[in-house]
Amino acid sequence: KQKALTEKDPVILFESMIALARKGDPKDKNSMLAALQSVNYDQLTESQQIDLIRAFELVMARMGMPDATAKAAIITYLDPHYPAKGGNELNRELIKVLAYLDAPKKKKKTVPLLSVAKDDNSAGQQSATNSSDLIMRNPQYGMDIAKILSKLPPLQQTFYATALSQVKTGWTPALLDEYFKWYYKAFNYKGGHSFVGFIDSSRKAALKNVPKDR
């Protein structure tokens, strides 16, 4: 265990912390989280950054919320890297952990992304892009397909909105207004009944966290 906590190779460290999270002692949680923070984030590839954040996520999911000091340290470590300039998958992992930790800047950073985030080829977002390829292969149907795709729900924006729906503190009137305007727009997308139901559930969860004076 001590060898795992002092491992210098980031790939081996991530694998070791994931293994310990699944079978280890919860008393080691803070030591494990500190070990993950010892990694130089900027020297990692994007794929390794995703693995690092998933290791944070698994440790906390299995062992519980860290204490206030450890929580603040993780926020200080991860917050400067969000939003990332890389792919959507990295940003999804970051917002999941930062929302769980209730990082104070996450709302101010995320709400503006609701209107500009675009889907990409990252995990979970290939379907719309694969459909877009049809436009190139079948130009005679291009305009019709493009119109259909333009009405599909933007998955990255939906992920951000849902991640914020459980956030209870730190909302300003301006952020709340911008946030709920996204839900109003989202109901116009053609995602089917399941999407509408999902969005409505997310909106209702978010409404529970609106201050009573709003």
Locations of regions flagged by a protein language model:
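Long, ordered, helix-rich scaffold segments
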Residues: K1-R214
